[in-house]
């Protein structure tokens, strides 16, 4: 047991982009931050920008690519002359099934125990393999819930920031104007910070809207742009 005075303030990892205005300064350690949106909205670009910012000063990160879309060229473009140094600070995991994803996350704890310089875990995306899993939907949802509970425990116990990207869908009983993040209440429950990413008419502009935050009111939004060096 500890007293309130023993609890330290949250540590933030800046994204050095306009997203920091929504996030209160950056990605928070000790919790899960979720970015969700349609294909092509910029979720992976956000993830890679965060990856670069988390590792450029010598800290390490784990990047889990579940979609097979990790682009070395894009990371090089974002990192520029820092690529050589940050490449040594990034662990890459590429599970090919939901079972492999769960196993990899279980094994991440061993990595965190051995390497105390890891500050960030990014999963892009959290649901790609979950969506194609065969079996009883209720049981698969339970497994997703256990996976998320494991991630939250790791974030708190090892004081790492966890970022997940998520996809969207339109419920069958709604019109196309209503979209929901996949994973429903499971991902919403375990994600303490949630940001929706939307495309704009201008293909270079995106809108990020705060849907959930530990200390800030939802509904705030900012515009950002995808550029060679990530996002601004």
Swiss-Prot record:
Coiled coil: none
Keyword Phosphoprotein on entry: no
Keywords, comma-separated and alphabetical: ATP-binding, DNA damage, DNA recombination, DNA-binding, Nucleotide-binding
One BP term from GO: DNA recombination
UniProt xrefs under SUPFAM superfamilies: P-loop containing nucleoside triphosphate hydrolases
Record GO terms (molecular function): ATP binding; ATP hydrolysis activity; ATP-dependent DNA damage sensor activity; damaged DNA binding; single-stranded DNA binding
Membrane-spanning intervals of the chain: none
Pfam family, one: Rad51
HAMAP family xrefs: RadB
Family: Belongs to the eukaryotic RecA-like protein family. RadB subfamily.
Protein function: Involved in DNA repair and in homologous recombination. May regulate the cleavage reactions of the branch-structured DNA. Has a very weak ATPase activity that is not stimulated by DNA. Binds DNA but does not promote DNA strands exchange.
UniProt-recorded name of the protein: DNA repair and recombination protein RadB
């Amino acid at each position: 047991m500890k007293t309130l005075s023993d609890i330290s303030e949250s540590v933030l990892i800046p994204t050095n982009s306009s997203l920091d205005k929504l996030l209160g300064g950056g990605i928070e350690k000790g919790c899960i931050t979720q970015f969700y949106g349609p294909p092509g909205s910029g979720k992976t670009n956000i993830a890679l920008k965060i990856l670069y910012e988390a590792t450029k000063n010598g800290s390490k990160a784990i990047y889990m690519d579940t979609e097979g879309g990790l682009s070395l060229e894009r990371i090089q473009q974002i990192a520029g002359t820092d690529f050589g140094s940050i490449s040594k600070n990034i662990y890459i995991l590429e599970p090919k099934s939901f079972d492999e994803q769960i196993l990899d996350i279980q094994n991440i704890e061993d990595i965190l125990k051995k390497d105390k310089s890891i500050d960030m875990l990014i999963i892009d995306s959290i649901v790609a393999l979950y969506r194609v899993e065969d079996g009883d939907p209720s049981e698969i949802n339970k497994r997703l819930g256990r996976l998320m509970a494991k991630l939250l425990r790791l974030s708190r116990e090892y004081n790492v920031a966890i970022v997940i990207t998520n996809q969207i869908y339109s419920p069958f009983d709604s019109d196309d104007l209503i979209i929901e993040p996949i994973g429903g209440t499971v991902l919403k429950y375990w994600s303490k910070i949630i940001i929706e990413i939307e495309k704009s008419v201008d293909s270079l502009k995106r809108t990020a809207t705060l849907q959930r935050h530990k200390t800030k009111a939802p509904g705030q939004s900012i515009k950002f742009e995808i550029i060679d060096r990530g996002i601004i």
